[in-house]
């Protein structure tokens, strides 16, 4: 019986390749699966590469909460929804922490774990990111906007400052 995760949301994804082992690539904070397209193209002959957008990122649905536990459950539900039993898992930055959570909680689903640009510790710069997120929330913009819509809504000078800080 497949477990049900009430907080999990369906993830938008891109897929490259039709043969070889399944490799799931999890992007970092403020990114999307699109960030890994050139990497996917470079190994497409050897793997089936799945690149989901995390909740509140890319084209995946937005949710009120975003914990590593929830993001790990999103990944496992993604695996279930796509008939993927045991996979290779690569995570970058935030995706690396999510990948570690998947491997820790669901070891039977992960044959290989690759973590890029992250360690299993709390980083002080997280507070800086949290301040940026709170500042963006205080701008009063609608919750569901694409990056293009945000760029049109804010003065160009402010946009340069925001993306420079990220």
Where are the predicted features?
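Active-site loop/oxyanion-hole signature of alpha/beta-hydrolase fold enzymes
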Residues: 14, 38-44, 50-90, 94
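Flexible "cap/lid" loop of the alpha/beta hydrolase fold
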Residues: 100-105, 109-150
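Active-site glycine-rich loops that stabilize anionic/oxyanionic intermediates
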Residues: 20, 28-32, 93
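Alpha/beta-hydrolase fold catalytic core
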Residues: 1-23, 44-47, 84-85
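Structural cue for short, hydrophobic secondary-structure segments
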Residues: 25-28, 51
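Conserved alpha/beta-hydrolase catalytic His-Asp/Glu region
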Residues: 142-166
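Alpha/beta-hydrolase active-site loop signature
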Residues: 30, 54-58, 120
């Amino acid at each position: 019986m497949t477990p049900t995760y009430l907080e999990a949301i369906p993830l938008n994804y891109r897929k490259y390749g039709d043969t070889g082992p399944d490799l799931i690539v999890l992007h970092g904070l403020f990114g999307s699966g699109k960030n890994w397209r050139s990497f996917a193209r470079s190994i497409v002959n050897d793997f089936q590469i799945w690149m989901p957008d995390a909740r509140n990122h890319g084209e995946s649905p937005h949710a009120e909460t975003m914990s590593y536990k929830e993001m790990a459950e999103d990944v496992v539900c993604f695996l279930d929804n796509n008939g993927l039993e045991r996979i290779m898992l690569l995570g970058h930055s935030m995706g690396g922490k999510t990948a570690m959570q998947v491997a820790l909680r669901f070891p039977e689903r992960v044959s290989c774990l690759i973590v890029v640009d992250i360690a299993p510790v709390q980083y002080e710069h997280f507070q800086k990111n949290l301040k940026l997120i709170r500042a963006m929330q205080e701008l009063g913009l609608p919750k569901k906007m694409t990056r293009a819509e945000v760029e049109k809504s804010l003065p160009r000078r402010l946009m340069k400052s925001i993306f420079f800080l990220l």
